[in-house]
Every structure is written in structure tokens, then in C-alpha cells.
Amino acid sequence: MKLTLLRHGETDGSRRDLYYGAADIPALPESLAALHENAAAYPRAKRYYTSGLLRTEQTLQALYGDVPHVQLPGLQEMNFGDFEMKSYQELKDTAAYQAWITDVEHNVCPNGESAKSEAKRS
């Protein structure tokens, strides 16, 4: 069996260096256009899966068109809770962020999850 993992197209969140995982933000139109333009370079598969988030659905569509696929919410990225859509600069001096960043594997983001719980879920 061969498994190929692809990350979704670029988002405003990635461009602005924001923490986001659970936020259902779209991929940028220019990113989707570039993916579509270069789709022939990406491997084809017998089965396709997405996390169900908009950016993953858009990326699949840009690369492969209307292929049948399965949405697996367990593939969603880490839920950063109260840190979602915020930057390091916004968070760095807060006690909650400092508590979390000391051990991201085990410490839980406020109203979010730890890296360990995300890995277990995935």
C-alpha cells in the first residue's frame, strides 16, 4: 500500500503566521489556481480522504476535480482553542500561552487540545 499525504493550499492564516487548525478558513484563490495549474504533477490515487474542512475540500477539488472521497474529521489539525486565528505576537506575553508553550505535547490550549490528544484522535 502506498500512502500520499498532501497539505491543503495556502490560507490567509498561514500567510499571516496564525495558529489555526479547527478554524474552517478557505484556501487562498491564488493558491488554488496554482494547484489546479500544476495538478498533473500530483499523484493519483484509488481513494481520497479529506478532513472535511473547507480548505481541504477546495484543495482536493483544485487538484483532482469532483472525485469521490471520504471526509474523516479525525484528520483535522490540532484545535488551538482560544489561540485560533491569533499570532505568536498576540499571544507571547499571556500567561495561558506561556503555560501551553512549555509543553505543547501534553498541555492543552484553553478550550482546545494538546498535541498528544490531537495525535491520538488522528
Where is each model-derived feature located?
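Active-site-proximal alpha-helix that buttresses catalytic centers in soluble enzyme cores
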Residues: 2-67, 116
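Phosphate-handling substructures
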Residues: 63-121
